[in-house]
């Protein structure tokens, strides 16, 4: 009894269940590939009629000489499986092809037909050129990956390390900043059937985790660069033994405040070196201006500058004494006294001649001058004895008056030049 599930060629009665060509103009005309290629005609069917290829998926690609009887459908599943699971994962590939194929059969068929067969010989060249270039440096060289720069050691005892939870050899803490950051990616997995939205979501999680790691490392670097760990444990006493730093000028303080947003891109040492170099630059500029002044006055040797400065101070002293003598001579000649505005005020008789000139030029009453003088000398003596004091000058004394009085007291020898 004929099998109704099979199809036969109407011309040669060959079995065409796996592959046949059906005429689109004639009814029930199906030919095998041999009869179709020979141009067979039967009944009203002609060779130029349109046709349709009917594939049952059960014909073989490699012909009758192929072992195992692999159908075209199985070949397609095999190629899909090796693309999905990768070469060598024969168990998953066999499960994808079907239960009728074992992992050994899948491996042997793929190696025989696709690698060692004609298809493999045509696609895979006999000699594959080496496209990998070794760029690693020689061992022990200046850029060798085996060389590592050790981190500066921290002066911490075992008890301090346990208290802080710090591991110096690893430069890690038992409790890191943002300790729960790893929970973002701990449950992530890459699946073959993920759509684009799921892939982008997982990439966003990874990007968030990387940013958290960078912030964690930034905070650790700040703690090390600025020596915050010993300061936290009270181990910064050695810093007090270091020589005192130079006095920072007002202009440098303002510049430090302006550049504060840039501190995060530099280490503490780099910042201090930068400002130290700027201070040296200002000192060099001042020295250059001084040397240019000497050159304009005809001085070309360093040892001559001391004599020039001494002579200049003598000239200024003689000029000041001459002005005082002229003022006294004018008063003796009956001219209007320059002290007429203050000579009748209280405390005038307590002032020296130079102090009278100063008060007259500053339009300052003798009592106010004596008050300011007393406060300044008192603060100076307390500072020399190591007693902390805060100067409380009167409100009527502005910066110009204060500077003039300080300079006068310094030149007169009441206070040292450092105090002014």
From Swiss-Prot:
UniProt: Zn(2+) 2 binding residues: 23, 26, 45, 49
Subcellular location: Nucleus
ZnF (ZZ-type) ranges: 4-59
Species annotation: Xenopus laevis (African clawed frog)
Domain of life: Eukaryota
Protein name: Transcriptional adapter 2-beta
SUPFAM superfamilies documented for this protein: Homeodomain-like, RING/U-box
Domain SANT: 65-118
Name of encoding gene: tada2b
Pfam families noted in UniProt: Myb_DNA-binding (PF00249), TADA2A-like_3rd (PF22941), Tri-helical_Ada2b_C (PF24533), ZZ_ADA2 (PF25299)
Database matches in Gene3D superfamilies: 3.30.60.90, Homeodomain-like (1.10.10.60), Winged helix-like DNA-binding domain superfamily/Winged helix DNA-binding domain (1.10.10.10)
PANTHER family: TRANSCRIPTIONAL ADAPTER 2-BETA, TRANSCRIPTIONAL ADAPTOR 2 ADA2 -RELATED
Predominant location category: nucleus
Function: Transcriptional coactivator.
